[in-house]
Amino acid sequence: MKKSLLFLAVLCSFSQVFAQNYGYWKKLSATQLPQESLIRTTSYSENQALFTLDLNEFRLALTNVPAVFSGNAGATVYFPNSNGELEKFYVWENSNFEPALQAQYPGIRSFSGNSATDLTATIRFSIDPRGIQTMVMRPDNGTEFIEPYTKDNSVYVLFDTKTRNTPKLPFTCGTIEEVLTHDLLDDTALTNRASNLSYKTMRLALSCVAEYTTFFGGTVAGALGGMNATMTRVNGILERDLALHLNIIANNAAVIFTNANTDPYSNGATGSGGAWNAELQNTLTSVIGEANYDIGHLFGASGGGGNAGCIGCVCVDGNKGSAFTSPSNNIPQGDTFDVDYVVHEMGHQLGGNHSFSHQTEGSGVNVEPGSGSTIMGYAGLTSYDVQNNSDAYFTFANIKQIQTNLNTKTCPVSTPITDNAVPVITFPLPSANTSSPATSFTIPKSTPYILKGVVTDPDGDAMTYTWESIDSAGTTASGANSVASPTKASGPNFRSFPPSTSPNRYMPAYASVLNGVLSTQWESVNSTGRNSKFAFTARDNHAGGNQQTNTTSITVTTSATVGPFAVTSQSTLGEAWAQGSTKTITWDVNNANTLAGSANVNIKLSIDGGQTFPYTLAANTPNDGNEDIVVPSTPASLNCRLMIEPTANIYYAINSKAFYIGYEVVTNCVTYNFTGAAFNLTNGTNSWTTKTINVPTAGTISDVNITVNATHTNLQNLQMAVIRPGGTILTFYNQHCTGSANMNATFDSQGPALACASPLVGTFAPSNANLNTLSGFSQQGNWQFGFKDVVNGPDSGTINSFSIEVCSQTTQLLAADTFGFENFSLYPNPNNGTFTVAFTAQSSDKIAIEVHDLSGRKILSNSYANQGVFAETLQLENAQSGVYLVSITNGTNKIVKRIVKQ
């Protein structure tokens, strides 16, 4: 039988530590694996890597791992990460089994821990006789997983959610939504909600169909290994977000079935359609007994569905054991099964409703646009998908629901937390000039803003944070209206993002604002008035367990009449500032100065493209729309931006284009003529007569002007167009000037409007095209021109000549201090390779001149005797067109200038 092989080329880039003391991991390189041996044949992520694991050596590393909550330091274990490194973790054993079950199956274990180098990264991993699975929740960089890659667990794949390639899978959550009687998102219940220093455990009866057991080898131990792997990830999320842990009950083996002909469950299609709800409840009631578990769940192996049976029904006899989860791809393991499906259905059982808003359910927690992206959303399953998979966390609306529900239950065992304190939110002060925290702000419409949190943790834990919308959508904000929009009057207008190490969130994403985009499909400022509410959640990621959260809220009111607040100066490419010069900054106030905290503004400067703003150009200056500033003595930069923000409010504005400091802009305009003979046009044709002009010199277009000399008795018959190198057609003359004969005209978008005359002579702006749209692209290459006479008749036309003027801009450092080089000059610049350097030397030493290209390669090196007055002409005979650095040295004096060779 011929086997189909999947070729996998994997680069070896890991640290030498792999070959040293912790060599139980081995990265695979240039490996061929039969496709039929793989759990799945599609790639997991762009950054995926394959490994083998010496399981025996790995088990030795786990020999003396302390128990979680023991108070002992964690054991050291190493795992590969998506950065190509072997990462050190401190880990504790954190069993998912009740003690009797754990004693019966000592080879099936679960662990939790924290990274030694990335203090906010937490790990969960499981091990059983077949192998391991891991989950590292890493803020700002996605979640990382290690899972079996081959069916025999001999090869593992490391992948991350940031570059995940997971395809959409069909899945339906059939849970019927119901609204719990507990408060939902009212402000009183929301304020400063924490995990209440209580660690809860619940007893989980986890049954499975026989096909699930078959997938894991056909034995009870194999099925328990699969359950343990899934619950390791599930409990990792529940503990971090809810301080809750589910333990599989001691006699769970009694509801693990190995024979599909005799198990009490329907087949996958029927069961996932809803039959399993009652079948599971009946099984748990009769086999386990209602007094012996708190929450029941069934794992299927096919069918593609989930149904919790009820919302918040844990601890309720006759209902608490009616939930199931089953995959659509026949693979009941892995991140999609564990995070997207199992935690979702268990979240329903614990009291959480759906958080998406593509449909509304009256639950009061439809707080995510579209499909949503958190656990209780429907990522990848709707027509309005934020993304294809769920992120591994609960949105706060669901955290609050579940906490509220569990506080009404008596079955969870609550243990007071004594080794970890709740993080303290000192909600942000609007500025250092005020003494009271603000929980509401009014901002201008169509203006971005920043939500800021201030948190202290008594234990010094590595904190992570989320800012999330808590505006639940109604029917008018569902379906196509569930996406973000500037005119959205209610419901969520900002998607949720996973926990971050920054307590601040830019609304919308800062990268979008830098690009001038204030509205995207999943984030948008409002152009109309409305109130928006947001929850700020702090997670403490406490090492060794007992994690705690705390939350508070803020209201942002968008004014219907004030704004937008926007910077209007520094809005064109190529603006250059000299250090020490005076510049004017302007902005549209639009009555923003009437808002609280907005009478004055701060104006800040960035020289790294807007990543940081370390320079304050004006502090606490009136918010009047105009300010003259002195440019500070910053390092030279080609990527400067401005931020203007009120002194005591949360909105801000960024200027629209990068500008320069310490550089000058050199504009070089060259006219290129068509060198061919005049040519006649064919009457009444839809076909272009095309000609080409080559521009040999590299450069970025800043302006284009086109001149045409044509003979025709009626210019209205003519069409003319241009295509830049690599571009699309742009028609700059389109049947204008009825009855006008002949032209010698230049088309310049900065020119006056077209004024028809006979002949048509002068400079005009094209009436139906904007040549400015060519700016910013490369000028080098073939420019195509098209001409046609679209009217059939006796009058024919001739293009006598045409040309294109292309202007490009280059930058060069402003002239440095020319001390020691009196009367210095370098000319011409730009030049054709020949230029003159002249100055009066202040030193008697020899004069040296070197020319380098921008890669550092030396092009020319000459030495000259010093005669006092120096004037030499230099030639760059074989140098290509481009920018070069000319260095002139006279003793201890040196100057460097840029030249442009055309």
What positions do the PLM features span?
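N-terminal prosegments of processed precursors
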Residues: Q20-I146, W276
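Loop and turn regions of beta-sandwich accessory domains that flank beta-strands and are enriched
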Residues: P622, S633-L638, N649-A815, P830
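C-terminal outer-membrane/trafficking sorting elements
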Residues: K2-V10, S15-A19, D817-Y827, N831-Q902
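Extracellular acidic, Ser/Thr/Pro-rich low-complexity tracts
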Residues: I443, V454-D459, D540, D588-T594, ...
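The catalytic-center signature of Zn2+-dependent metalloproteases
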Residues: I249-A275, C315-A392, E468, A473-V483
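Fold-level signature of zinc-dependent metallopeptidase catalytic domains
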Residues: Y22-S29, P34-S37, V155-G309
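Residue-level detector of functionally pivotal "anchor" positions at catalytic/ligand-binding pockets or at interdomain
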Residues: V413-T418, Y663-Y672, V806-Y827, T840-Q842, ...
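Exoplasmic/lumenal beta-rich domain surfaces
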Residues: N247, T466-T528, N602-E627, G727-S775
